[in-house]
Swiss-Prot record:
<comment type="similarity">
    <text>Belongs to the methyltransferase superfamily. RsmH family.</text>
</comment>
<keyword id="KW-0963">Cytoplasm</keyword>
<comment type="function">
    <text>Specifically methylates the N4 position of cytidine in position 1402 (C1402) of 16S rRNA.</text>
</comment>
<protein>
    <recommendedName>
        <fullName>Ribosomal RNA small subunit methyltransferase H</fullName>
        <ecNumber>2.1.1.199</ecNumber>
    </recommendedName>
</protein>
<dbReference type="InterPro" id="IPR023397">
    <property type="entry name" value="SAM-dep_MeTrfase_MraW_recog"/>
</dbReference>
<keyword id="KW-0698">rRNA processing</keyword>
<feature type="binding site">
    <location>
        <position position="83"/>
    </location>
    <ligand>
        <name>S-adenosyl-L-methionine</name>
    </ligand>
</feature>
<dbReference type="Pfam" id="PF01795">
    <property type="entry name" value="Methyltransf_5"/>
</dbReference>
<keyword id="KW-0949">S-adenosyl-L-methionine</keyword>
<feature type="binding site">
    <location>
        <begin position="37"/>
        <end position="39"/>
    </location>
    <ligand>
        <name>S-adenosyl-L-methionine</name>
    </ligand>
</feature>
<dbReference type="GO" id="GO:0070475">
    <property type="term" value="P:rRNA base methylation"/>
</dbReference>
<keyword id="KW-0808">Transferase</keyword>
<feature type="binding site">
    <location>
        <position position="57"/>
    </location>
    <ligand>
        <name>S-adenosyl-L-methionine</name>
    </ligand>
</feature>
<feature type="binding site">
    <location>
        <position position="112"/>
    </location>
    <ligand>
        <name>S-adenosyl-L-methionine</name>
    </ligand>
</feature>
<dbReference type="GO" id="GO:0071424">
    <property type="term" value="F:rRNA (cytosine-N4-)-methyltransferase activity"/>
</dbReference>
<feature type="binding site">
    <location>
        <position position="105"/>
    </location>
    <ligand>
        <name>S-adenosyl-L-methionine</name>
    </ligand>
</feature>
<dbReference type="InterPro" id="IPR002903">
    <property type="entry name" value="RsmH"/>
</dbReference>
Amino acid sequence: MSQISSLRHITVLLDEAVAALNVRADGRYLDGTFGRGGHSRLLLQQLGPNGQLLGFDKDPLAIATGQALAAEDGRFVVVQRSFAELGDEVAQRGWTGAVSGILLDLGVSSPQLDDPIRGFSFLNDGPLDMRMDPSRGVSAAEWIASADEDEIARVFKDYGEERFAKRMARAVVQRRAEAPFERTADLAKVLTDANPAWEKGKSPATRAFQGLRIHINNELGDLERGLDAALDALEVGGRLVVISFHSLEDRIVKQFMRRHAKGEADKLPRDLPIIPKAFEPRLKLIGKPQYASEAEVKANPRSRSAVMRVAEKVR
């Protein structure tokens, strides 16, 4: 078994997420982050013969797994696209406003993190790439080679929430003048040496690597586009289930769901007798945020930071 094929992914909040979708046997569902198919497989078990499931992923290895599943089960189709583009895909299929549930499991999968060739991790040395789809866009090495010091600092600070972002960016620019960054371990060492206050139990390079990965893949921009598209794609009564893994993602999801659950009546004159439909809430929040259980965290430490939020379309 090759190193890549042996890499395993443990699906986070598996039962909870599929239960939150409130699966209808004949419904149409979207798995916006297919990954290695954990959520999709369980969802298919709950669909009847007329149910349909459409999976999205940018990662070519995830697509290969999805195509194998599609060959086994005719109710499932997978496309190599970001979930940010789900609106276009849904429209092409005539599903706009007719999707029963959408699941987004954000972040990077274990196979991506653990495979040195992908360049996501400082723990396993590999090419400094970080792209979810290696055939598209600019690699982390290419971006680090050309970005100015202020831009590097902004990415580390805004997306990695790294308080020593300026100091780290300065170290990166000074070092690249001598030789380009090509390996993850090389960048990690420079970042580690530039961080004067290590957090217990966390590598000094963790936050900067997170910020770089988010920027390279436009993760927050994709999330905002994907949430807007998901709301339009859902039918009334359809569920949106989102699992996030860091505060930046969760803040976007929380604010999106709250904004659409509140509506925009506060923008209208107070004495208006009837609230126009365009200003009424489009979502209602379902339950409280859910977190991985102690047992799940023990079995899969990467689930510790997971937060799941659920909303239902009402208009």
